[in-house]
Amino acid sequence: MCGITAIFNIHSSAADLRQQALKMSKRIRHRGPDWSGIYQGKTAILAHERLSIVDPASGGQPLRSKDGKLILTVNGEIYNHRELRGQLKDEYEFQTGSDCEVILALYRKYGVGCVEKLSGIFGFALYDEANDCYLIARDPIGVIPLYIGHDDEGHLLVSSELKGLEGFATAYGQFPPGHYFYSRDKDFTRWYIRDWMQYDNVKDKDRKS
């Protein structure tokens, strides 16, 4: 169990919001007593409270790509991370042994399509500094908690728990499972789609009882 918080759409000084981000993160520190980390950019702040499971020595977050342009804060476990790491090791230079760093490698190769490559439970916020855009996503059935909201200034806020948003967000709610939010689309997109979810694929749908 870890805790993540983030502030996006910052159009004034990010330094002014840093203290707010730290307060948001402190409220969920019980989720991750092993490490506290924060990234502050011009339009985004990402923070993380870590409970060490995989790679306790070097897996502190927010994770960053080697060039520092991709930043990730994530709570979860990626079950197929070894398989993905093997597939991507020639295209991406991994900086840690964290199972979650494969998300950065996948995003660099597939963009928002990275989410569909993941097998696991997760809630994450990823900031693409070079393109000034961000991606937020949650696992298929919502095993990992994640909440999203906004304030009167137009900032988008993210937290693993509602208490991270209380008093800062004027409107908030649960981040829908099996969806991602991409800043360039400005809307939620369902990424987890399976045939069995469609009624027309039920074999006996027309049979009368």
Q: What would you call each of these model-derived segments?
A:
Residues M1-K208:
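Cysteine-centered catalytic environments shared across enzyme families
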